[in-house]
């Protein structure tokens, strides 16, 4: 906008550049001096009438509107940052005109009522504590204000912009930290939320229990390399085994079913595993699924669909354990056309929902394999070799096969539900392996702790020894399986042929007494 002339007593026109430089100067001392100069100059400006002031303001607004229209049609949108370039008519940019017009209106209204007495000290600035030198001349101050370059004003704007950028970056950093803190709180809250699955809630409580169980002495740090400490690994395994399995009352909701029918179902599932060349762990998982389903389901299972439950459990276990599980059509063919693939899939969904998707128990076969791995680790005879999780087994596969066949038979016996998988595997190892001290170091149990379980499994172990001597079973190790995995393939054994030997051993042990050492 065009500058205005005022009638002063001194006759010297006042340049607006002096006032603007005083306001926009980034230097503290210079800014304070120029402020004092501008106030002194303002005293000599006569009071204007309201009509003159309104006319000047109107002309400023018209100039601004015309310049904006001209700029919008010729040069595109207006830049966000104010420019400090002067125009040909001596006026500042449009963005400054509105700011300084408001300043003049405020200063003129205030100047008419109150004015500072010349020589009165200025109030101290909040950011400054140093006092100015009183010997400085007023003319020198005015000359400094006139000689202040325009680049200082531009630098002031840039410095102000840098300060604003720094403040905005600090605010963004604080917001990022606050967002991370909120995410951490949300993660902790999600971890503390209760689980909808009751079985998973029990598993979570057991796994997160701070009470640790001492690991067996044979479970060293070298064998747990890359997994965790022996104490924590063993504690997690033991707590996982504390999740209850099925009980002897699993058929109470199914009056049409009998214990003998369950044994027939288990024998048929074993035969299916033999035909499909499935692993022994698959067979044990399938029997566990079927038993838990029969105990937990509220719907009555009748004799017509009793085999369907075992087929669905076998289908789930194969998909959980096997690399190449059998197809549903293959299992349907094993039922001799009694059930279709749709029937098996529907029952599979029912069993999975009733088990609440808990498919990972540690079976007796897994516990026995763990114990034998600890027992089969030879002592380190050479100090140049470091102990690790790789070992050379000292036990023969024939010993392993003899013990796992006993576990297969115990799986079909209803009395085995009185004990956990872990204790049954340890008891079988106590009966079939010497010395006891080595078994105690591998299992973490003392012989006296498992007295009841040992008394239960001893007749069965002795019966299998006699049965093996008289009737050598065929295909103990199948020829169709790879040599390194042949002992893990399930082989069908007719348990009803072993029952007479078990009864004889139990009667003999009853006559001799259970406390006699074998």
UniProtKB/Swiss-Prot annotation:
Region of interest: Disordered: 1-193
Biased composition (Acidic residues): 155-192
Composition bias type Basic and acidic residues, residue spans: 13-46, 82-107, 135-154
Composition-biased stretches (Low complexity): 108-119
Listed GO biological process terms: cell division; DNA endoreduplication; embryo development ending in birth or egg hatching; G1/S transition of mitotic cell cycle; germ cell development; germline cell cycle switching, mitotic to meiotic cell cycle; gonad development; meiotic cell cycle
Tagged with keyword Cytoplasm: yes
Disulphide bond pairs: none
MF (Gene Ontology): cyclin-dependent protein serine/threonine kinase regulator activity
InterPro entries: Cyclin (IPR039361), Cyclin-like_dom (IPR013763), Cyclin-like_sf (IPR036915), Cyclin_N (IPR006671)
Location(s) in or outside the cell: Nucleus; Cytoplasm, Cytoskeleton, Microtubule organizing center, Centrosome, Centriole
Entry similarity comment: Belongs to the cyclin family. Cyclin E subfamily.
Protein name in the entry: G1/S-specific cyclin-E
Highest classification ranks of the organism: Eukaryota, Metazoa, Ecdysozoa, Nematoda, Chromadorea
